[in-house]
Structures are given as structure tokens and as C-alpha cells.
Amino acid sequence: MLKYIIPTIMLMPLTWLSKNNMIWVNSTAHSLLISFTSLLLMNQFGDNSLNFSLLFFSDSLSTPLLILTMWLLPLMLMASQHHLSKENLTRKKLFITMLISLQLFLIMTFTAMELILFYILFEATLVPTLIIITRWGNQTERLNAGLYFLFYTLAGSLPLLVALIYIQNTVGSLNFLMLQYWVQPVHNSWSNVFMWLACMMAFMVKMPLYGLHLWLPKAHVEAPIAGSMVLAAVLLKLGGYGMLRITLILNPMTDFMAYPFIMLSLWGMIMTSSICLRQTDLKSLIAYSSVSHMALVIVAILIQTPWSYMGATALMIAHGLTSSMLFCLANSNYERIHSRTMILARGLQTLLPLMATWWLLASLTNLALPPTINLIGELFVVMSTFSWSNITIILMGVNMVITALYSLYMLIMTQRGKYTYHINNISPSFTRENALMSLHILPLLLLTLNPKIILGPLY
């Protein structure tokens, strides 16, 4: 465990002691080394967990998310270079420090063994994210977005703290591995209903559940590129990870409580997909598509079958890489045209032909083209929901069609057609951007060859 935490901490002095022309090289190279070392975590035998210490452990559910977290830091650094080129030296270093501290908190969140430690770190990830959004966002609305983000997440997770104290008093431990062997079932009573809601609400706001999702498009649209990437790729997965961990404790209460939330998610999935078709803002479209994909994950986790769990974990990893790549592409447009409105950035295929290839690949993985892991995740979720209730196949089918529609709409609006004259003199695509896109798409394509490593503990 320390071989990931200590190098991550040492990134901070490296950043602050680097000369001006070496900051990006040093931090990106060092973080890439950390992300390559993290691949060693894949070498786990069977379904046992690696108990690093009494506080940290890692199993086949948290390992893919850990690796995704560490893989994302060099990509965020590569994506932010242009955005920060006009800032002064101290601010650059401060920004990189924020990203590093965020990665540190996330590594510890995904490996925490005690629920209360998980809660503390879960809340700690708020601080760097909030600073990144409110300090380095593009428009003045970023303060409003930061406020939404902070209060939704805080108000959602305060009841969780109360529920955790209650569990601590009844069971005597908050250790994940101990709680699995706590045999006393949680029966239907008013207090247990509230306990279930308190435990789940924090993660449902984070996911986000349809109806509690209003902070997400705001935060995504106003955040700088690194903020959007880490928000879509990892912070939403904290919600899914927490739900997967905490449903083990709340049995059989979840079967009793899940019905309205599954209905709300299925409805929200269709609604947010439909909202995507009416978006003019590119980042907002990708943000709403995230809500619709995460609704699938909520449904899968609440159904609680081995298949749906595997689908949920696969979909979380697939969505993390795909949405992060889409945000990078949207940002490469924004850096050239200084607008997120899709109608102003049309016909880019003629000017940036290589970027059009990345756009095509990203859109196709987003609409779950076979044989990508997005499709594997979605198929598992669709099959498990179908066995839960046959009528859901209608909603799932409609959702898949709408997903394909808005992905192609996004691709055609930005790449096809006649380009407008104000983008005649834009700069070509840089090697940095092509490297960034290939580092997003490469894991997706490689996971297609061996998807079982991200199917979670039940495979």
C-alpha cells in the first residue's frame, strides 16, 4: 500500500522544487510511473483480499478503481497544460498539488477497511475538488456550481455519519471484513428504514440518482478540464463503490426498500438520455450522459444478483475511461474555439482529421458498440434487470436507442457539415492531445481482450 501512497506524497515536493520549464515533465513522468506500478495490484490470486494493514485492504472490487484513479493523474496533468499556460508559477504548482492530494485521498478511500475511515476520506475528496472547480473554472458561474456541489454532497452524507455511529453501537465494529460475518439481519422497522435511507442517500447523491443530480451538470460545465475528468471518472464511482460495500450490511432491508429507487433510476435513465438530445452545450451533454449511465449502475446494485454486480463494476470502469475521454475531446475543441456551443464548432473533420478519429472512437464506445467493455457491462445489467422484471426490457431498449442517438448527434454536430469561417485559423492537433486520447482508448481496447479483471469480486 505504501508503495503507492509514498510516491504520491513525494510528488508534492517534486512539483514545488521543479524549475518552471520542468514542472509538467517531472510531474507527468513521475505520476505515469506510479500508474504503471499500480498494475501490479492486478496480480491477486483468486478472490481473496490483500490485507495491507489493519486500516487498508484491497480486493477485486477496489483494485480496478484504484488503478483507474492512478491512471488518471498523468492524463489530467497532460490535459491541463494548455489551460494553465498563462497562470503564474505558484498557481501552476498549487493546481498540481490539488490534483495530487485528490489522488492521495482517493487511493485511501478505495482501500479503507474501516467504514468511518472511508467516510472521512470520502468527505476529504470534496475539498480539493471544490478548490479546483471554484478557483480554476472558466466562467463566474463556477462559484454557484461549487456551492451546489458542496451542499448537495454534504447534506447527503451527514445522515450517513449518524447511521455509521448507530451501526458502531449495535455491532461494535465498522470493519468491512467483520461486518460481512455479522449474521443478524436488518428487519423492516421504521428505524431501519431510516438507517437504510441514511446509508444509501450519501452514495445516491454522489452517483447521482435522478432527482438529486442537479449539481452534476453544473459542476461539470464549470470545472476546468482536470476537474471534469476526475469528477466523471472517479468521484462518481465513489458512490457506486460505497453502495456495493454497504449493501452487504443492510440485507435483507435492500429488497424491501429498493423498488422505488429502481423505478426512479429507470425513469431517470430515459429522462436524462432524452435531455441529452436537446443540449446545445457539449460539456453539458456529456454530463447528462454520465447521469444516465450511472442510473444503470444504481439499478444493477439494487437488484443484488451476482450478474448485476459484475455489470455494475464493468460499467463503472468503462464509463470512467469513456467519459473522461469525451471531456478531453470537448476541451480540445474549447481550447481552439473558446466556446462549448456545438453549433459553433461544426465541420471540424476537415480541419482536424486525426481528432475526428478520436471523436469517432469515443462516441462508439459511449454508445456501447460491441465488443467494448461498455457493452459487456450494459448487457450484464440488462440481463439481470430482465430476470428481475420482464417489462424493464422496454425501458432498457429505449435507453440504448436514445444513447446511440445522442452519441451520433454529438459526433455529427461537431465533425460533419461545412465548417464556419471563424475557425479557419485554429491550431492543429498536438502530439500531447493525441497521446492523451490514445492513453484513454488503449485501456478500453485492451480490457476488451480480457474483461474478467474488472468484473469485480463475484466473477
Curated annotation (Swiss-Prot):
The modification N-formylmethionine is found at residue 1. GO terms for cellular component: mitochondrial inner membrane; respiratory chain complex I. It is found in: Mitochondrion inner membrane. InterPro entries: NADH4_N, NADH_Q_OxRdtase_chainM/4, NADH_UbQ_OxRdtase, ND/Mrp_TM. It comes from the Eukaryota. It is a multi-pass membrane protein. The keyword Transmembrane helix applies. Its EC number is 7.1.1.2. GO terms for molecular function: NADH dehydrogenase (ubiquinone) activity; ubiquinone binding. It catalyses: a ubiquinone + NADH + 5 H(+)(in) = a ubiquinol + NAD(+) + 4 H(+)(out). Disulfide bonds: none annotated. It is an enzyme of class 7 (translocase). GO terms for biological process: aerobic respiration; electron transport coupled proton transport; mitochondrial electron transport, NADH to ubiquinone; mitochondrial respiratory chain complex I assembly. Keywords: Electron transport, Formylation, Membrane, Mitochondrion, Mitochondrion inner membrane, NAD, Respiratory chain, Translocase, Transmembrane, Transmembrane helix, Transport, Ubiquinone. Belongs to the complex I subunit 4 family. Core subunit of respiratory chain NADH dehydrogenase (Complex I) which is composed of 45 different subunits. This is NADH-ubiquinone oxidoreductase chain 4. The gene is MT-ND4.
